[in-house]
Regions:
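Catalytic core of non-heme Fe(II) oxygenases with the double-stranded beta-helix
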Residues: 65-189
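Non-heme Fe(II)/2-oxoglutarate
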Residues: 2-65, 71-81
Length: 189
């Protein structure tokens, strides 16, 4: 159901992605769960390196197919993070870029993937944003979860149609210690 690869990118690439996310003035969306997004898609990327990363992923993993859209999330140092949801794209590729030395609680900061997709009858709003409905469904179905632990320069590929969420965020104080992840959504081949 998922694939994990560590240290797939050069440290310089990880550092540049992190530096950009932490210092840019771009703030596309602010979320009450303690993070903001920097959005991009196939027609607009705010940093040329992002396009290079997308091309590198497509070359290394041809099954990913066409790039759809993506974002970087920059989290508060302590935050609940992204709530359970599913996405419409076939593949979700997550890349974590904050150094491990910035982590306070090693049991947090990763990603939880559930073993269930939403019912086919659910709308995008229901499976992507209806937190209460999703939590009830996960409880009702007794879905099992897998926790992927956080690690800097860790790449995680999974079917984004399965419910998933952030495993809370707990990083050291200071703006340069904030958890940053890049998400790349692909349509599949």
């Amino acid at each position: 159901r998922y694939y994990v690869a560590d240290n797939i990118f050069l440290p310089e690439v990880i550092d540049e992605l992190r530096e950009f996310a932490l210092t840019t003035d771009i703030r596309n969306e602010q979320y009450k769960e303690g993070y903001f997004s920097i959005n991009y898609d196939s027609t607009y990327v705010p940093l040329p390196l992002i396009r290079d990363v997308v091309l590198g992923l497509q070359n290394k993993f041809p099954f990913l197919g066409e790039f759809d859209r993506g974002w970087a999330f920059v989290y508060n140092n302590e935050a609940p993070g992204v709530t359970p949801h599913a996405d419409p794209s076939r593949y979700n590729v997550n890349l974590w870029v904050t150094p491990d030395k910035c982590v306070v609680d090693e049991e947090k900061n990763g990603l939880i993937i559930y073993d269930i997709k939403p019912p086919l009858s659910w709308t995008y709003e229901e499976y992507n944003s209806s937190k209460e409905l999703i939590r009830k469904y996960l409880d009702y179905t007794k879905s099992k979860k897998t926790i992927i632990p956080y690690s800097c320069n860790r790449l995680l590929i999974f079917n984004s149609k399965y419910f998933h969420e952030t495993n809370n965020v707990s990083m050291k104080d200071g703006p340069m210690n904030r958890r940053v992840n890049y998400t790349f959504m692909f349509k599949g081949d």
